[in-house]
Amino acid sequence: MSDRQAALDMALKQIEKQFGKGSIMKLGEQAERRVSTVSSGSLALDVALGVGGYPRGRIIEIYGPESSGKTTVSLHAIAEVQRQGGQAAFIDAEHAMDPVYAQKLGVNIDELLLSQPDTGEQGLEIAEALVRSGAVDIIVIDSVAALVPKAEIEGDMGDSHVGLQARLMSQALRKLSGAINKSKTIAIFINQIREKVGVMFGNPETTPGGRALKFYSTVRLEVRRAEQLKQGNDIVGNKTKVKVVKNKVAPPFRVAEVDIMYGEGISREGEILDMASELDIVQKSGAWYSYNEERLGQGRENSKQFLKENTDLREEIAFFIREHHGISEDSGAEGAEDSTLLD
């Protein structure tokens, strides 16, 4: 063995002794090369994400205009984690959590940890403490825009606090990112949209909280309402587009289209029907939808209602959709190779 190799081996032993086993290794020895995921609670979004759900131990940003469905998308993820026996937490900086609506989406509100912090620092410190405990599987911060720094709250109404929130987020994410990765916690940051003043060309929209969250996020989702869903003259929900604008674990820019029904959340029947029709698993002839020569109903809403009443048939169709896209039933726990190892 050469002197250089002996010196390297000694240095590696010293590093492992000081910082623990696994603190340094060769890239090819990486034990876990695949991304472990948890379903988003929406089959269409699981497919758009490319790995079958949200990657564990990563930061996710969900942003969009007001009332576009950001919190609904996050609550579905919480419900899915709880369904698998995991622990969830919700940092409600907006003080707008509706427990009745959350319950309708499948969230077990008796087990959900809820914090309504007074300041941005307090909210992020609570989030850090929960992440470092290693006992929380998913944490949702709603929203970044509402994480107001203490200095701004204690100051007068007209005071200028330029860059204060951006500095707070930058510092918090520097501390949080490593802990999130080690604890395998999914951290979802909900964010709002602001208009940049004086932008003549390009997109004038931006998200508050500075650039740090954009950099630290593994996945960024843009949620926007596409059209209203009507039953007769009544508006019963919105067709919503969820665009994956950044993805470090699969190809980005895929779009999931879902029906968000008032009081119900994401319509599983709607997304299954649309995806199955695209793949010709369900055949559409005129206004009629059919599966294996069995008629589901005339028109989309009637077919959705039929699938709602026949859950075994609905899940059978969902199985074939997952199989076509290579997503396993356990939310794609095998995932895909982690491309961030090469970032």
Curated annotation (Swiss-Prot):
UniProt-annotated binding residues for ATP: 64-71
Q: Which GO terms describe its molecular function?
A: ATP binding; ATP hydrolysis activity; ATP-dependent DNA damage sensor activity; damaged DNA binding; single-stranded DNA binding
Instruction: Give the SMART domains listed for this entry.
Output: AAA
InterPro entries in the record, alphabetically? AAA+_ATPase, DNA_recomb/repair_RecA, DNA_recomb/repair_RecA_CS, P-loop_NTPase, RecA-like_C, RecA-like_N, RecA_ATP-bd, RecA_C_sf
Going by the entry's taxonomy, the superkingdom of the source organism is recorded as: Bacteria
- Which Pfam families does the record cross-reference, listed alphabetically? RecA, RecA_C
PROSITE patterns for this protein: RECA_1, RECA_2, RECA_3
Gene3D superfamilies registered for this protein in UniProt: P-loop containing nucleotide triphosphate hydrolases (3.40.50.300)
- Write the record's keywords in alphabetical order, separated by commas: ATP-binding, Cytoplasm, DNA damage, DNA recombination, DNA repair, DNA-binding, Nucleotide-binding, SOS response
Tell me where in or outside the cell this protein is found. Answer: Cytoplasm
Can you quote a single GO CC term? Answer: cytoplasm
Per the UniProt entry, what are the Gene Ontology biological process annotations, in alphabetical order?
A: DNA recombination; DNA repair; SOS response
State the protein's purpose.
Can catalyze the hydrolysis of ATP in the presence of single-stranded DNA, the ATP-dependent uptake of single-stranded DNA by duplex DNA, and the ATP-dependent hybridization of homologous single-stranded DNAs. It interacts with LexA causing its activation and leading to its autocatalytic cleavage.
- Return the similarity comment: Belongs to the RecA family.
| Name used for this protein in its record | Protein RecA
Record lineage = Bacteria, Bacillati, Bacillota, Bacilli, Bacillales
